[in-house]
């Protein structure tokens, strides 16, 4: 008889226990991850940045709304009007519509899209320095400034709407988001708050092998709550002072296991691209999207709620195309998300100055080999429960927390941060 001491428990083995995954789908997603491997020779590592902005009314606005209230998509002088005014400054070939509704714009270096509550997300082309991000962001602000002033809108870079309630913010006319809103309204806590009224900063990094990807995912997942605490920026929740030190973390903790939080099985010794692919394929899709699935070309309802169906239930028995893969991955919101790059997702929206400090810190920790080795050594051997303890400790004890048994000043020194969040390096 085996004893507990003899057994090697792999966390992943106890997720998705029916193993209902199509082998061709599994290979498609694993190949998608493999295709993201960059050549380390002569490649310093790129940085992708997305900044979400909360649109609120200015003091002197044309609809006489109270200052600071959320601006929705369809209202008079709303976000749709802002996008329409910007069209001439962006590439017509990159306009994004759903039906007659303009939902996105793009040009070289910059892509504008909308989050469910009309939050304006700006995604930038890959940069290799903080200066590159600052130049692109200045271009974005210069382009959008006159349209914002005309419609009485200002962009707030915080984690949550300062005055408005989430229930007062309409979801934009995108079927995927309306399905998600309905799903989260019944299947989770705080899901609608996250969708309609929150905003974040996300930073993406490259990987140079499967082993490098796993190491960066583990280190990013372990250090993420600490960095989230140092860069926290959600002073408000539902029109009041926020009772949560880490509001965004509180949302994701309650939205659903496997779909959010720590990637299942990440700290198992055998975790790799195949397990990452299993995670996204075996989970219920939440939203099924077959708009780019040729076999469903005549489907009258190509985007629908899929509360129980997973990829094998929805997509044909063949290799998945890139649109299908990207959609399946996008229905998961783990702290660190693997695509054909690694997306670090812990942070509230931040002003550009603080975003630059965060970017410099991330670049140093994940691309300086000596710094990465040192940072990883302090979280080596941890488990998922240790990450959860770290999150809870920061939420409960704040400055007195001891992430992984060490005081916050230790982590500041390791990450090269001053107490005000300025990156000073090591």
Put a short name on every predicted segment.
Residues 2-189, 197, 354, 358-367, ...:
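Terminal catalytic/cofactor-binding subdomain
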Residues 53, 203, 344:
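Conserved, mostly hydrophobic/aromatic
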Residues 63-64, 130-132, 213-215, 228, ...:
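Short helix/loop capping segments that flank catalytic or ligand/cofactor-binding pockets
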Residues 129, 208, 350:
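Glycine-/small-residue-rich active-site loops that bind phosphorylated ligands and cofactors
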Residues 149-150, 154-337:
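Loop-rich catalytic cores of soluble enzymes, especially ATP-dependent carboxylate-amine ligases
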Residues 299-386:
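Long, well-ordered mid-to-C-terminal structural blocks that present hydrophobic/aromatic surfaces
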């Amino acid at each position: 008889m085996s004893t507990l001491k003899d057994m090697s428990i792999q966390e992943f083995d106890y997720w998705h226990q029916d193993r209902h995954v199509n082998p061709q789908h599994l290979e498609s997603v694993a190949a998608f991850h493999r295709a993201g491997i960059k050549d380390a020779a002569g490649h310093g590592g790129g940085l992708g940045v997305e900044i979400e902005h909360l649109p609120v009314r200015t003091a002197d606005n044309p609809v006489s709304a109270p200052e600071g209230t959320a601006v929705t998509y369809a209202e008079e002088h709303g976000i749709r009007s802002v996008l329409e005014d910007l069209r001439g400054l962006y590439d017509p070939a990159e306009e994004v519509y759903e039906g007659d509704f303009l939902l996105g714009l793009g040009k070289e270096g910059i892509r504008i899209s909308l989050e469910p509550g009309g939050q304006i997300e700006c995604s930038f082309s890959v940069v290799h320095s903080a200066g590159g991000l600052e130049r692109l962001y200045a271009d974005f602000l210069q382009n959008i400034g006159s349209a914002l002033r005309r419609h009485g809108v200002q962009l707030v870079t915080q984690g949550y709407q300062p005055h408005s309630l989430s229930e007062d913010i309409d979801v934009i006319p995108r079927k995927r988001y309306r399905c998600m809103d309905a799903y989260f309204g019944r299947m989770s806590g705080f899901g609608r708050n996250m969708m309609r009224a929150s905003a974040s900063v996300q930073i993406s990094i490259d990987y140079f092998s499967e082993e490098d990807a796993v190491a960066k995912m583990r280190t990013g997942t372990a250090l993420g709550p600490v960095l989230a605490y140092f860069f926290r920026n959600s002073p408000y929740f539902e029109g009041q002072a926020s009772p949560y030190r880490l509001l965004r973390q509180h949302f994701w903790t309650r939205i659903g296991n496997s779909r959010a939080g720590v990637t299942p099985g990440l700290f198992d010794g055998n975790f790799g691209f195949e397990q990452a692919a299993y995670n996204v394929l075996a989970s219920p899709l939440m939203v099924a999207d077959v708009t780019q699935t040729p076999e469903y070309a005549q489907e009258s309802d190509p985007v629908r709620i899929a509360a129980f169906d997973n990829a094998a239930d929805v997509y044909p028995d063949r290799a998945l195309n890139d649109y299908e893969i990207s959609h399946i991955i996008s229905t998961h919101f783990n702290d660190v998300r693997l695509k054909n790059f690694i997306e670090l997702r812990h942070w509230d929206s931040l002003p550009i100055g603080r975003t630059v400090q965060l970017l410099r810190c991330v670049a140093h920790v994940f691309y300086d080999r000596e710094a990465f080795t040192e940072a990883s050594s302090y979280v080596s051997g941890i488990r998922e429960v240790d990450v959860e303890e770290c999150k809870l400790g920061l939420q409960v004890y704040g400055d007195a927390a001891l992430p992984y048994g060490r005081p916050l000043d230790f982590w500041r020194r390791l990450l090269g941060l001053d107490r005000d969040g300025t990156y000073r390096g090591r």
